[in-house]
């Protein structure tokens, strides 16, 4: 069956939209918003009508007939923790997206705009594998400090999309496999996927795991406490050291991994040291996730922007191929992943989950 889908992925200073016929992209647009436009609104939710109008206007400009749409799909926002899958957008979800129960984020607008347009057209609206996807085993939640449980914050949409893609490509099905998925972008998340559930994963935003282009990953916690109480830093300055100015930015003042590798290959010893540590930490975290799966790993999947690297990918492969064979799905296609999530429901392959 043929479905036309409008996909909405709001970012902090832009809104990315795509129109798909099944998995074929008809067109894609990145609608950029100036600081002046964004500053007019006190909260993220206040931007709702402005962003919705911008989307409808571009569709009108392209002479696209929105009455031909089968469903609207939004990027999932900072909801309460949920298991992965495609969710029908309902009133309970809208209320939580409005207030941002786990924090303010532009992606909170994805479901809100999707439902608003969908309701006007009398068609369903969905979100797919939001960033708060949480399928951790109970044992993976304990950190050692009762007040500080481990949290599942990772690249759920892309990790799930490539895991399902490998399930299809291999003919074995995602639900029948044990996979380790490594997303390498601005942050690095390494997930243990056990028969369709991400039973353990590092908190790639501000928790633990390998350092990345912009994030610190796991740090020595005693020294971090001393830093916090040294009187030299505000809370936000310490947080920025962990998220934004950590990793490559902290050591080399750049988040450009390709540029660092180029310098290393031209003989820069400092770049070589940081690159080798980055590779080492990802390797070590893959080993942890192999242990979380009791050594029963069918395949390791590498994805995200850094998975295009002709240097890092072979280096990482040679470090971990003793655990399981490695398949590479470079980059990430969030719009396609959102479309695929809706198609699985419209085709009856999956049932829409209720929030």
From Swiss-Prot:
GO MF annotation list: acetate kinase activity; ATP binding; butyrate kinase activity
Annotated catalysed reactions: butanoate + ATP = butanoyl phosphate + ADP
Enzyme Commission identifier(s): 2.7.2.7
Example of a GO biological process term: acetate metabolic process
Keyword Transferase in annotation: yes
A Pfam family of this chain: Acetate_kinase
Keywords of the record: ATP-binding, Cytoplasm, Kinase, Nucleotide-binding, Transferase
Top-rank taxon, per record: Bacteria
Major location category of this protein: cytoplasm
Single GO cellular component term: cytoplasm
Root EC class: transferase
Subcellular location(s) of the protein: Cytoplasm
Stated family: Belongs to the acetokinase family.
NCBIfam families: butyr_kinase, PRK03011.1-5
Protein name: Probable butyrate kinase
């Amino acid at each position: 069956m043929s479905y036309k889908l409008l996909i909405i992925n709001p970012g902090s200073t832009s809104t990315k939209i795509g129109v798909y016929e099944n998995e074929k992209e008809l067109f894609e647009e990145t609608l950029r918003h100036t600081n002046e436009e964004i500053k007019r609104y006190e909260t993220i939710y206040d931007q709702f009508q402005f962003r919705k109008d911008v989307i409808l206007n571009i569709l009108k400009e392209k002479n696209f007939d929105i009455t031909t749409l089968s469903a609207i799909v939004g990027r999932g926002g900072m909801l309460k923790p949920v298991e992965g899958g495609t969710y029908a957008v309902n009133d309970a979800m809208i209320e939580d997206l409005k207030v941002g129960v786990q924090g303010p984020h532009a992606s909170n607008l994805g479901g809100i705009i999707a439902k608003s347009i969908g309701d006007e057209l009398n068609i369903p609206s969905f979100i797919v594998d939001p960033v708060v996807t949480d399928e951790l085993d109970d044992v993976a939640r304990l950190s050692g400090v009762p007040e500080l449980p481990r949290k599942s914050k990772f690249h759920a949409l892309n990790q799930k999309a490539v895991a399902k893609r490998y399930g299809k490509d291999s003919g074995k099905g995602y639900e029948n496999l044990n996979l380790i998925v490594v997303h390498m972008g601005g942050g690095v998340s390494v997930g243990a996927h056990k028969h369709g559930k991400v039973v353990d994963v590092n908190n790639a935003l501000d928790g633990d795991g390998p350092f990345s282009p912009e994030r610190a990953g796991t740090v020595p916690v005693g020294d971090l406490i001393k830093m916090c109480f040294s009187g030299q830093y505000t809370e936000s300055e310490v947080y920025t050291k962990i998220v934004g100015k950590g990793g490559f930015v902290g050591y080399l003042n750049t988040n450009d991994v390709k540029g660092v590798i180029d310098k290393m290959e031209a003989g820069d010893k400092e770049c070589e040291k940081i690159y080798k540590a980055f590779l080492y930490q990802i390797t070590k975290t893959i080993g942890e996730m192999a242990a979380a799966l009791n050594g029963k790993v069918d395949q390791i999947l590498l994805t995200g922007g850094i998975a295009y690297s002709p240097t890092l990918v072979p280096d990482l492969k040679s470090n971990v191929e003793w655990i399981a064979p490695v398949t590479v799905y470079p980059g990430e296609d969030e719009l396609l992943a959102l479309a695929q999530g809706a198609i699985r429901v419209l085709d009856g392959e999956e049932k829409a989950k209720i929030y």
